[in-house]
Amino acid sequence: MKPGIHPEYRPVVYRDKGADFAFLTRSTSTSDQTIEWTDGNTYPVIDVQISSASHPFWTGKQRLLDTAGRVEKFRQKYARRGPQSG
């Protein structure tokens, strides 16, 4: 790798405030905010709206949509009512 052209790769804390969940990983992302982690060190923190701790796919709280019912409702609403003159 060429020196001086790549962003710094360092430890960063990602925090999902909605799920009260945070994890420490390595990233090139930057932040002005910091947090003291459980190991006593201070790391940049990036707040996210959704993570594996709050996403319905990963939490098992999925909501299935009745797409067949919606399609049938659409067909009934816009079905042709016989031959149109014109």
UniProtKB/Swiss-Prot annotation:
Cited InterPro entries: Ribosomal_bL28/bL31-like_sf, Ribosomal_bL31, Ribosomal_bL31_B, Ribosomal_bL31_sf
GO cellular component terms attached to this protein's record: ribonucleoprotein complex; ribosome
Alphabetical GO biological process terms: translation
UniProt keyword terms in alphabetical order: Ribonucleoprotein, Ribosomal protein
Matches recorded under Pfam families: Ribosomal_L31
Domain of life: Bacteria
Recorded GO MF terms: structural constituent of ribosome
Subunit structure: Part of the 50S ribosomal subunit.
Family: Belongs to the bacterial ribosomal protein bL31 family. Type B subfamily.
HAMAP family: Ribosomal_bL31_2 (MF_00502)
Name recorded for this polypeptide: Large ribosomal subunit protein bL31B
Species, as recorded: Salinispora tropica (strain ATCC BAA-916 / DSM 44818 / JCM 13857 / NBRC 105044 / CNB-440)
Gene that this polypeptide is encoded by: rpmE2
